[in-house]
Amino acid sequence: MKENKKTYLVTGGAGFIGSNYIHYMFRKYGDAIRIINVDALTYAGNPENLKEVEDRENYTFVKADICDKAAIEKIFAENEIDRVVHFAAESHVDRSIKTPEVFVQTNVYGTAVMLNCAKAAWELPDGGFKEDKKFLHVSTDEVYGSLEEGGGYFYETTPYAPRSPYSASKAGSDMLVKAYMDTYHFPANITNCSNNYGPYQFPEKLIPLIINNALQGKKLPVYGDGKNVRDWLYVEDHAKAIDMVQEKGRLFETYNVGGHNEKQNIEIVKIIIATLREMLPETDPRREHVTEDLITYVEDRKGHDRRYAIAPDKIREEIGWEPETMFAEGIRRTIEWYFAHEDWMKNVTSGDYQKYYQEMYTTK
């Protein structure tokens, strides 16, 4: 007999947003839920992100690729899955420019596998789907393209206009989910979120990259003129939004999730420098070299989108979600986490990361 608790299948749960989501869910629901985490453990997936929960009886880790249909079918066959929360994706724009085919394989084909397996497991013989099942596809605001400086926002009705191989692959996966909802009446939602920051983020991304380099006295690479604008959201606020959409979102709807926090990249870098200097004791030798002199402008990213800005009106009005963490607080919490987890950073920045870093950040 099935236990009276919801079972969540989380894909990519060893990555940055996925692991934060799992931690959030266990903090909120404790033993009232069960989570199965399937992750291929590629370079950005780190089992250390989930050390605190790995011994829980209601947590199971499965090392598998979402493109492996047999492995995913086995999970559905052996478990009564109530929710799929689909994070698993290749997500770094720079890497997509070098190896776009990897992004198409994981983000588009992998999503098709997940959709097919969930559909097969949840379909009823006489049509329709089992009650209280839902597939939540986690996506990005980058599918909407680029906005002009100082004007306009992305809404759920904004036409898709992806400009990088990464955003094109995510747009493709979004369209697959939309097609399943339209064709099969498949129980799903899509969330499109702005840039996240917080604990466990792999240091190829801007904020952990700048924190890590500044503490080591290394150059702080800034693309182009540094004036590209992003909307930043603390990752725990994103985890809460996903949970609320799962429980309160209307089926077949898309919800934009944003932080109401637009900042230029160069602003972010300068805020991190100032916050590090404020937080480091005067006796800490690292404090002396954490200055704006480390800022180094590098060749701009190919096709670099100028501005992203999300309008989260719909999720606020329908579900009651709003970002709770102000950027000043969130960046301090993020820096505190990296201070407390220096060994984690050392482990993830060894080996292949150093080679990648040298390839990506050449001086102008």
Regions found by a protein language model. Give the residues of each.
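N-terminal Rossmann-like NAD(P)+-binding domain of SDR-like oxidoreductases, especially those catalyzing
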Residues: M1-N196, Q246, T275, R333, ...
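Residue-level marker of alpha-helix boundaries and capping positions
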Residues: G12, S167-A168, Q201, W232, ...
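Generic recognition of short, well-ordered alpha-helical segments
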Residues: N20, E48, K74, R95-K98, ...
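C-terminal substrate-binding subdomain of Rossmann-fold SDR/epimerase-dehydratase oxidoreductases
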Residues: N20-Y24, K28-Y29, I35, A64-C67, ...
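A glycine/serine/threonine-rich, flexible loop-to-helix segment
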Residues: V53, G150, P203-I211
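Residue-level recognition of oxygen-bearing side chains
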Residues: A71, V102, Y109, F202-L206, ...
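A general, composition-driven signal for non-globular sequence regions
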Residues: E80, S164, F186, P199, ...
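Generic non-transmembrane alpha-helix signal with a bias for helix starts/N-cap capping motifs
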Residues: T111, D174, L206-I207, Y308-A309
